[in-house]
């Protein structure tokens, strides 16, 4: 009861068109009127004295398409929490494609975003097959380079690398642990999470269900393999 959790969808669109995605996207950014309404709602909640913690989750679509909203609202949230002596924390679920080194620094230092969930669907081949850019382009190398820049920083954060697992990329996901994954293996800020791709809904793409679903839950087996290989695992 002392925790107020707020999930904010900064933008209705996404720069990816993943083959298994369930969302229907609209190219709509958050209006200043909606931002003002969120601030007013938050003021009323925080000044009630009921809360000691505020947790904000930035979501989408792709939330970094609405980076201006994060940039405008975060300082207001932080100031309100300081005023009412409330602990503030913030998280973002992002595909990481737009998260440049500069934006990451701002999110971490200025806006107190210290928790990140980023998806890599195996190695370069399998990821680029499942997680396609809106324009049909490839995404793995840029995301991986951005993740490496994150790892090379000195900031405090937790980054969950999520793998959506299908029959098509199962082997590639396993091989990530002995190839590209070694960059993050000894860094406790990075944690791995596995999820079977399910029948999540058609979304708005004809290419939906171009992946073959697994007939078993692979998350436990893959998590066990990651732990025995020396990786840190995210709690469910």
Residue spans for each PLM region:
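Conserved alpha-helical substructure of the radical SAM core
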Residues: 1-102, 110, 114
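"Short basic amphipathic alpha-helical interaction patches in structured regions
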Residues: 22-24, 34, 107, 131-134, ...
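Alpha-helical scaffolding segments of alpha/beta enzyme cores, especially the outer helices
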Residues: 37-40, 68, 72-79, 102-106, ...
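Short, conserved phosphate-binding/catalytic loop or strand-edge motifs used
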Residues: 54, 124-125
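Buried hydrophobic side chains on well-structured beta-strands
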Residues: 56-58, 92, 118, 161, ...
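Cofactor-binding loop segments of dinucleotide-utilizing enzymes, especially the Rossmann-like FAD-
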Residues: 61, 95, 121, 164, ...
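Non-cysteine beta-strand/loop elements that form the S-adenosyl-L-methionine
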Residues: 104, 108, 112-124, 189-197
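Radical SAM enzyme [4Fe-4S]-AdoMet core and its adjacent flexible, acidic
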Residues: 125, 129-236
């Amino acid at each position: 009861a002392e925790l107020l959790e707020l999930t904010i969808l900064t933008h209705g669109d996404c720069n990816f068109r993943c083959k298994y995605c369930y969302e229907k996207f609209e190219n709509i950014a958050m209006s200043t009127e909606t931002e003002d309404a969120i601030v007013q709602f938050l003021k009323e909640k925080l000044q009630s004295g009921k809360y000691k913690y505020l947790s904000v989750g930035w979501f989408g679509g792709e939330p970094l398409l609405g980076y201006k909203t994060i940039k405008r609202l975060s300082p207001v949230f932080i100031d309100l929490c300081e005023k009412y002596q409330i602990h503030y924390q913030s998280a973002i679920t992002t595909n990481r494609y737009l998260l440049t080194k500069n934006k990451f620094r701002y999110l971490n230092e200025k806006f107190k975003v210290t928790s990140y969930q980023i998806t890599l669907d195996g190695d370069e081949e399998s990821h680029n097959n499942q997680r396609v850019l809106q324009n049909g382009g490839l995404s793995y190398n840029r995301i991986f380079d951005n993740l490496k820049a994150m790892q090379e920083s000195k900031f405090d954060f937790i980054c969950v690398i999520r793998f959506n697992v299908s029959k098509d990329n199962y082997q590639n996901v396993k091989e990530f642990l002995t190839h590209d994954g070694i960059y993050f293996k000894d860094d406790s800020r990075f944690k791995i999470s596995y999820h079977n791709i399910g029948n999540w809904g058609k979304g708005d793409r004809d290419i939906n269900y171009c992946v073959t679903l697994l007939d078993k839950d692979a998350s436990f087996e893959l998590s066990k393999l990651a732990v025995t290989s020396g990786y840190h695992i995210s709690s469910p």
